[in-house]
């Protein structure tokens, strides 16, 4: 345990390269009273990691360790740590300082894989308040899928959406957030519509319980198919991950008094090109969702401990294959999550 491998972003002329480095392993003797030394065992990627890597948002992450999502084992704890002990299996929170309550803009200054070093390293030190026990019986690879994608889906549908049995949900695409949203919605007794450009991915979604699948390459105005399927009622919830390129169809899909959880920007950062009047006319609630708090994460873990859910891991890569994993993320071929094993 002499060296800690890690990947960092290194600025090039237009974006960032991924550069492998080593550094000394943090010493347990140097832990502050409330800190824990974690051996990272697995990391998962999110679309946000592509945004940072390709510099799509113009954010300076030069020298930072990528990836917000990972899980591992506690090796040592500081003198005042009361929540954990060595050997505990944990995941880190996306926002390490957001423990509970309302979101504060200050939390943006402390996000893993952004302003703070992320999880693509062998060892990391965290305050005990930034960690959560992983679900019982889950592998590190499975648990690594949770901190961003699963928590986001949970907050969108459960805490903010108040999803009820018998309601209807539309999830866009088959990435990490959307597939967790599909799985949570089915466990909670909802009917789910899934959109994708791939019939093969839609078949996988059906196997997870999707009630209606729409290939948006074949049916660009997919809201019409959804509208007919729903008995011209619309759906109660839309998990909107596309952004400006899909927002018009999402607005046309949502029911009166419905809910749109605005989560992603897969189609870019520009403004919507359509009128927002349907939101007003249908009395729709629009929620911006940026992951969630530690309380949200722990509530979700409690749910997972009492329900059967298997994270959908599309491919696993070795640590030294990290650039290949990022390329695969960019290809958008994956269904669910991409994991890097350490």
Language model region names:
Residues 107-108, 188, 206, 241-312, ...:
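Glycine-rich phosphate-binding loop and adjacent beta-alpha segment
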Residues 178-179:
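N-terminal Rossmann-fold NAD(P) dinucleotide-binding loop
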Residues 26-44, 54-99, 115-117, 135-138:
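Glycine-rich beta-strand-centered segment in the early N-terminal region that forms part
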Residues 168-174, 186-249:
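Adenosine-nucleotide cofactor-binding segment
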Residues 71-73, 89, 123, 168, ...:
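Residue-level marker of beta-strand positions
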Residues 95-172:
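NAD(P)H dinucleotide-binding glycine-rich loop of Rossmann-like/cofactor-binding domains
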Residues 2-4, 232, 308-312, 323-342:
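C-terminal capping/lid region of NAD(P)-dependent oxidoreductase domains
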């Amino acid at each position: 345990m002499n060296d800690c491998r890690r990947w960092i972003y290194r600025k090039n002329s237009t974006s960032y390269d991924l550069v492998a480095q080593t550094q000394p392993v943090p010493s347990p003797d140097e832990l502050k009273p409330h800190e824990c030394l974690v051996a990272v065992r697995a990391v998962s990627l999110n679309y946000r990691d592509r945004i940072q890597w390709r510099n799509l948002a113009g954010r300076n992450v030069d020298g930072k360790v990528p990836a917000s999502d990972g899980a591992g084992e506690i090796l040592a704890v500081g003198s005042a740590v009361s929540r954990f002990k060595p050997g505990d299996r944990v995941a880190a929170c996306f926002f390490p300082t957001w423990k509970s309550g309302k979101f504060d803009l200050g939390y943006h200054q402390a996000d893993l894989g952004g302003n703070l070093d992320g999880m693509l390293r062998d060892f990391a030190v965290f305050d005990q308040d930034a960690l959560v026990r992983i679900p019982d019986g889950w592998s590190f690879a499975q648990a690594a899928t949770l901190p961003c994608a699963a928590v986001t889906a949970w907050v969108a549908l459960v805490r903010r959406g108040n999803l009820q049995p018998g309601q209807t949900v539309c999830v866009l695409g088959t990435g990490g957030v959307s597939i967790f949203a599909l799985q949570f919605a089915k466990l909670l007794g909802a009917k789910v519509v899934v959109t994708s450009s791939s019939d093969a991915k839609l078949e996988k979604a059906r196997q997870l319980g999707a009630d209606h699948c729409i290939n948006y390459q074949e049916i660009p105005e997919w809201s019409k198919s959804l509208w007919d399927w729903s008995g011209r009622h619309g759906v109660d919830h839309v998990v909107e991950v596309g952004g400006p390129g899909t927002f018009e169809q999402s607005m046309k899909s949502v029911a009166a008094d419905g809910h749109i959880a605005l989560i992603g920007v897969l189609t870019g950062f520009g403004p919507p090109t359509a009128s927002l009047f349907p939101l007003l006319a249908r009395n729709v609630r629009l929620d911006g969702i940026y992951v969630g708090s530690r309380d949200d994460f722990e509530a979700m873990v409690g749910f997972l401990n009492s329900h059967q859910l298997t994270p959908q891991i599309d491919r696993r890569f070795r640590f030294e294959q990290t650039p290949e994993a990022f390329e695969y993320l960019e290809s958008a071929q994956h269904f669910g999550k991409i994991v890097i094993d350490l």
